[in-house]
Amino acid sequence: MVRSGKNGDLHLKQIAYYKRTGEYHSTTLPSERSGIRRAAKKFVFKEKKLFYVGKDRKQNRLVIVSEEEKKKVLRECHENDSGAHHGISRTLTLVESNYYWTSVTNDVKQWVYACQHCQVAKNTVIVAPKQHLLKVENPWSLVTVDLMGPFHTSNRSHVYAIIMTDLFTKWIVILPLCDVSASEVSKAIINIFFLYGPPQKIIMDQRDEFIQQINIELYRLFGIKQIVISHTSGTVNPTESTPNTIKAFLSKHCADHPNNWDDHLSAVSFAFNVTHLEPTKNTPYFQMFSRNPYMPETSDSLHEVDGDNTSMFAKILDAIKEADKIMENKTTSLGQMENNNLDELNKSKIIVKKKPKQLNPFHLKVGHEVLRQRKNWWKDGRFQSEWVGPCVIDYITESGCAVLRDNTGVRLKRPIKMSHLKPYIRESSEQESLYLLQGSVVADHDYIGLPEIPIGAYQANILVEDATIGIVDNELLTSSKDRELLEYRNTKISPLIDDHSSLEKQTFSLLDSSNQVLEYLS
């Protein structure tokens, strides 16, 4: 440790002098000698150089003292061989792995903060170039190309198929391929150009090297540059290029006709274009040509060829219609299942209604005696509470908190929440003295009862809610037991009622009235 205000370089020089000579440097104070001896245990001399080895003596860090050597070390550790600059954490790690001085952390921070290259790079924001999304507004302006296969080798040596789909009309064109080389794919695309003309852009989900080879072939064969772009270039919205229906049907059809599947690709694409309904409720054929194709009114000409034999196109057409129905039913059933699952999930949810918080569960009022909750602690698997008091409610604030007074009449400093209060129930001896000393004030304590009076006496009093205290209709008390309870009750309460008026007029303290209380009780 270096004492506060001492130069760190001087501290290292004193340690080096002590390790080299075994004596203290002339600048070492007597109070610093014990610290120098303890610190010297973490250093060793090797080849006339001082190294820091630490307490475990496993480190081997060269001690740097001069300012020029520090700057050289910081420059080497901050900049790497490629010219990039490290941050504070990486630079500090590189410095501390081989070098040591007392202020290494602060020096690294100041060096990085003062680096002009780092400050310029920190404030430079690299803005990505804006990508202009291609809008699909016209037929055959933006198309996608998908490659499918390998299938069973046909009689004409075809193994793959290329599917070109117009994103605006969903018009598809399918051609067979012998392989998926750039030259073979480019020739198939050129043949489609000769039928419908070249689009503005062609989107392919292939690697960039393959797309570049196709662009070179298209420029050589057709003279058009950079017409094919990658699907991941972000120039179009991520939409499904080829419908799943045609992909699934084509895979099944090629498996069912392994030898001549390539002869039926034109029929498959035409059947799909005249039957598949888009969200606009129009077929791709109508979207492409603004008219419907001429189709025979009856299917006899299609289904009756050479007697009972059915034409291949009719089979393909019926199969595609059936595939569309299956896909539509599957989509509908999936939607219904999702809705049913959501309904079941909503029904299974247990709606837990939170019990409203009772701000004043005991209906406490001004003048009531209460106990206040001082603290809670966890014990035996539940919260335990400590209640102190009694206190009297002085008044209730607008926020629903109670201001209390203690037994001596001193008001408490902080208001207490009503939920942290509960009624104070006095013992029998305390209640009798309370009745005698407080007079009519006891009438406000509607929750304070007489524990020494049996429960039946309260039941008799509840039957007549509007009657005066101590007066009960005798007709309601039919049994002898009730009469006994009434008499017992009257003997307890009637003396208080008789002297009620006189007690109200008298104002005396507890000390002055002690003799009168003893005389009254006797």
UniProtKB/Swiss-Prot annotation:
GO MF annotation list: nucleic acid binding
Domain Integrase catalytic span(s) in chain numbering: 135-292
Segments passing through the bilayer: none
Biological process annotations from GO: DNA integration
Highest taxon in the source lineage: Eukaryota
Modified residues (Phosphoserine): 502
UniProt xrefs under InterPro entries: Integrase_cat-core, Integrase_H2C2, Retrovirus_Pol_polyprotein, RNaseH-like_sf, RNaseH_sf
One Pfam family linked to the record: rve
Entry keyword set: Phosphoprotein
Tissue expression as described in the entry: Widely expressed. Also found in tumors originating from parathyroid gland, colon, stomach, bladder, uterus and prostate.
Protein name: Gypsy retrotransposon integrase-like protein 1
Organism: Homo sapiens
Record gene name: GIN1
